């Protein structure tokens, strides 16, 4: 199959592009490079440098490349920033997705795999969280993803566009050979920041709040390796190609770690090297952060046969460390 990957030059997108190629598919990437890196793409993968807000450019990409399916990653992704810049988030994530859906509806009505998020669930009352838990996002970012899921379903009802919406929990890690990895323009993710702090690029790690109702007072998240997530996309695209109906699946490991436990795991990974343990400082809560997000992923395991290979947090962090240690300035190195 030929797959159009929006946001394919980004962190998860570039790992998924490799996984799709590895599964024998061909790929075209559409990305405005606002936070992605052309260097993250394997040689020979066509890159359409375009913005989803440019409806005509999106339509043209679909007409020229005639893909069989779309995997839609392109979005702004920061929970905290979405609270202070809501307009940017609604415009980029909701209007951008609307443009893509409109273009699909006007051309080939191909199926779509969408990057959704655990942030849909907000302050979840059950843990691990099943897909039918109430959707009550605590951030604008989460709202933009919920709105996009709703638009996708409306476009299915009106135009027959099938979808698999993958609700990722916290994505981390890198290909074990350290050749590509996480290099977000604004660094906000816990593990990326901790490893850059270990490399001496930041003085200390801030812990955003220790008064949450969790075992040590810091937020709990479910950390999933980017390669396991990439494999979920391959399975989803292939299922849709074989005629699968639309669904939404959580993608996570099913157990969560507190912020302090993650920082301990980072210290354990760097222990014995020339790098000092992390200096930690308590800071106020970050707006929009729910206390705990842990996935019930049994549905994707049963329906698509997905099975995560990276189940040990230190092992996952080790792969990210390999990338950051060998590329301390990301794709600039
Ligand atoms: N990283 C996580 O932990 C996580 C968790 C849940 C969901 N997600 C979702 O996964 C997707 C990918 O996240 P990521 O961590 O790889 O982020 P990323 O910033 O590395 O990738 C996003 C890509 O989309 C591109 N992009 C953004 N807006 C665009 C637009 N208007 N037009 C064209 N291209 C545009 C960027 O240049 C970038 O290459 C996002 O949709 C995000 O919401 C990420
Ligand atoms: O320097 C830091 C950075 C983060 N945190 C905390 O660590 C946890 C994880 O934060 P982060 O790595 O920024 O991820 P999330 O805010 O949980 O969001 C990620 O995970 C979501 C799914 O759960 C995705 O939807 C988002 O796109 C993605 O950014 C949160 O409790 C943060 O408050 C700190 O304490 N200090």
Which stretches of residues belong to each language-model region?
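Residue-level signature of the cytosolic catalytic core of signaling kinases
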Residues: 50, 54, 183-187, 255, ...
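Oxidoreductase cofactor-interface core, primarily capturing Rossmann-like NAD(P)-dependent enzymes
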Residues: 161, 177, 205-207
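Short capping/connector residues at structural and topological boundaries
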Residues: 46, 84, 88, 125-126, ...
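C-terminal substrate-binding subdomain of Rossmann-fold SDR/epimerase-dehydratase oxidoreductases
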Residues: 191-193, 199-333
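Short acidic, glycine/proline-rich loop/turn micro-motifs
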Residues: 176-179, 218-219
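N-terminal Rossmann-like NAD(P)+-binding domain of SDR-like oxidoreductases, especially those catalyzing
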Residues: 1-174
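Short-chain dehydrogenase/reductase
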Residues: 90, 138-146, 180, 184-192, ...
């Amino acid at each position: 199959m030929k797959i159009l990957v929006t946001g394919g030059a980004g962190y998860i997108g570039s790992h998924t592009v490799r996984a799709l190629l590895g599964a024998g598919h061909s790929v075209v990437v559409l990305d405005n490079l606002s936070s992605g890196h052309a260097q993250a793409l394997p040689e020979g993968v066509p890159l359409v440098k375009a913005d989803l807000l440019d409806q005509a450019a999106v339509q043209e990409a679909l007409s020229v490349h005639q893909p069989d399916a779309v995997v839609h990653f392109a979005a702004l992704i920061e929970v905290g920033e979405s609270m202070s810049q809501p307009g940017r988030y609604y415009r980029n994530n909701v209007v951008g997705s609307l443009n893509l859906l409109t273009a699909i509806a006007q051309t080939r009505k191909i199926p779509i795999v969408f990057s959704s998020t655990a942030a849909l669930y907000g302050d979840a009352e059950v843990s691990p969280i099943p897909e039918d838990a109430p959707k009550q996002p605590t951030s604008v970012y989460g709202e933009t993803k919920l709105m996009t899921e709703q638009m996708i379903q409306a476009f299915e009802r009106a135009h027959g566009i099938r979808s698999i919406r993958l609700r990722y929990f916290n994505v981390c890690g890198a290909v074990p050979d350290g050749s590509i990895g996480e290099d977000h323009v604004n660094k906000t993710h816990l593990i990326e920041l901790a490893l850059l702090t270990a490399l001496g690029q930041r003085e200390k790690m801030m812990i955003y709040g220790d008064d949450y109702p969790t075992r040590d007072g810091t937020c709990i998240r479910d950390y999933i390796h980017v390669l396991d997530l990439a494999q979920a996309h391959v399975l989803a695209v292939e299922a849709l190609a074989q005629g699968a109906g639309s669904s939404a699946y959580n993608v996570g490991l099913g157990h969560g770690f507190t912020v302090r436990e993650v920082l301990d795991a980072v210290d354990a990974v760097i222990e014995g090297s020339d790098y000092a343990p992390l200096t930690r400082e308590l800071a106020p809560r970050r707006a929009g952060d729910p206390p705990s997000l842990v996935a019930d992923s049994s549905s994707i395991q049963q329906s698509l046969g997905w099975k995560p290979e990276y189940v040990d947090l230190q092992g996952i962090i080790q792969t990210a460390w390999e990338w950051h240690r060998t590329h301390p300035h990301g794709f600039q190195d």
